[in-house]
From Swiss-Prot:
PROSITE patterns: RIBOSOMAL_L10 (PS01109). Keywords: Ribonucleoprotein, Ribosomal protein, RNA-binding, rRNA-binding. HAMAP family: Ribosomal_uL10. Part of the ribosomal stalk of the 50S ribosomal subunit. The N-terminus interacts with L11 and the large rRNA to form the base of the stalk. The C-terminus forms an elongated spine to which L12 dimers bind in a sequential fashion forming a multimeric L10(L12)X complex. Forms part of the ribosomal stalk, playing a central role in the interaction of the ribosome with GTP-bound translation factors. Belongs to the universal ribosomal protein uL10 family. Disulfide bonds: none annotated. This is Large ribosomal subunit protein uL10. InterPro entries: Ribosomal_uL10 (IPR001790), Ribosomal_uL10-like_sf (IPR043141), Ribosomal_uL10_bac (IPR022973), Ribosomal_uL10_bac_type (IPR047865), Ribosomal_uL10_CS_bac (IPR002363). One of its GO terms (molecular function) is large ribosomal subunit rRNA binding. It comes from Cereibacter sphaeroides (strain ATCC 17023 / DSM 158 / JCM 6121 / CCUG 31486 / LMG 2827 / NBRC 12203 / NCIMB 8253 / ATH 2.4.1.). GO terms for cellular component: large ribosomal subunit.
Length: 171
């Protein structure tokens, strides 16, 4: 790789580190090409990506960024999984690590917070943005549906009583 290509890679990595909600770093020694393609496909499904880059270039790209300390994780054969959604890449990486013992999560970064492997698992256990929105909407909508049910209950009770009275008179 010549100098211009290296500069381009450093620039791309810098953009990844700045724009990603989470970056997960893992060792991938011993993983086959097919397994790596499977990981990439799973990441794409959730809007994330996987990148293998030279550790030295990644450390240069991290210089001056809030997640600069993540450079300590970049040793050996490392892969970076990232996504704009702070939970998506962590969920996929954690699930993949459970299925494949050769994929070992080293840690990651979420903004300026450096995550250890347990931190990545904690982030992976969190609900996604869409799930959180759904929970909030259901919490907001629950009182309204309860009120509507309470208002509608007397009318349905009266209708039930009237139908029972009609049945008694008919019998």
């Amino acid at each position: 790789m010549d100098r211009a290509q290296k500069e381009k890679v450093v620039e791309e990595l810098g953009q990844i580190f700045e724009s990603s909600g989470v970056v997960v770093v893992a060792h991938y020694a011993g993983i086959t090409v097919a397994q790596m393609q499977d990981l990439r496909a799973q990441m794409r499904e959730v809007g994330g990506s996987v990148r293998v880059a030279k550790n030295r270039l990644a450390k240069i790209a991290l210089a001056g960024k809030p997640s600069e300390k993540m450079g300590d994780l970049l040793t050996g054969m490392t892969v970076m999984a990232y996504s704009e959604d702070p939970v998506a890449a962590a969920k996929v990486a954690d699930a993949y690590a459970k299925k494949n013992d050769k994929f070992v999560i080293l840690g990651g970064a979420m903004g300026d917070t450096i995550l250890d492997p347990a931190g990545v698992k904690t982030v992976a256990a969190m609900p996604s943005r869409e799930e959180l929105i759904a929970q909030i909407v259901s919490c907001i909508g629950a009182p309204a549906s309860n009120i509507a049910g309470a208002i509608g209950a007397p009318a349905s009770n009266i209708a039930g009583i009237l139908s029972t009275l009609e049945e008694r008179e008919a019998a």
